[in-house]
């Protein structure tokens, strides 16, 4: 074997060994939780993000708040849904909520992330006006990135224009 082939093969082997030891940037750590860590609370584990904020919760407890196209205003027919969440949180001081804003696929990614944020802030403001402690409320906008309903129809778009309540134990 000539010297150039040997050097090339050796260099390739060393590079492969070095790269195989690198961590996947999407894994978030050796636990594979993508930047999420856990805190034990009794028998439950509260998943938190890199900022220590809750990253998950129970989404099945309350109805979603739906929004009109290109709107972040809470419509009067949706207020009773927010009031139900406020009543629950005001009566359960050990609970908190993550408000998750979703949009349909129309519009740019940046616009939809901002619209999802405006939607959750509208819901947040209403919850606070009903006496919910702002420290019990976290917000997250998915924009169009995490559709609740797949499809390219008016029905699918309508279902994706919403705020989801994810309840967690503090």
Predicted regions and their residues:
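Short, low-complexity, Pro/Ser/Thr/Gly-rich segments in the mature regions of secreted, periplasmic
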Residues: 158, 163-170
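Structural preference for long, well-ordered alpha-helical segments within the folded cores
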Residues: 81, 122-129
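Bacterial N-terminal signal peptides that target proteins for export
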Residues: 1-10
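Short acidic capping loops at alpha-helix termini that bridge into adjacent secondary structure
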Residues: 134-138, 160
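C-terminal motif of bacterial Sec signal peptides marking the signal peptidase cleavage site
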Residues: 17-21
């Amino acid at each position: 074997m000539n010297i150039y082939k040997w050097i090339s093969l050796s260099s390739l082997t060393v590079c492969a060994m070095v790269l195989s030891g690198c961590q996947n940037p999407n894994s978030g750590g050796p636990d594979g939780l993508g930047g999420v860590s856990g805190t034990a609370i009794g028998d439950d584990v509260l998943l938190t993000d890199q900022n220590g904020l809750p990253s998950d919760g129970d989404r099945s407890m309350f109805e979603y708040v739906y929004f009109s196209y290109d709107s972040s205003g809470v419509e009067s027919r949706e207020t009773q849904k927010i009031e139900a969440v406020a009543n629950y949180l005001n009566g359960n001081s050990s609970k908190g909520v993550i408000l998750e804003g979703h949009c349909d696929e129309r519009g740019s990614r940046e616009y939809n992330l901002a619209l999802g944020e405006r939607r959750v802030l509208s819901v947040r403001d209403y919850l606070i006006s009903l006496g919910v402690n702002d420290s019990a409320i976290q917000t997250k906008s998915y924009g169009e990135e995490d559709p609740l309903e797949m499809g390219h129809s008016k029905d699918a778009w309508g279902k994706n224009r919403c705020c989801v309540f994810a309840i967690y134990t503090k």
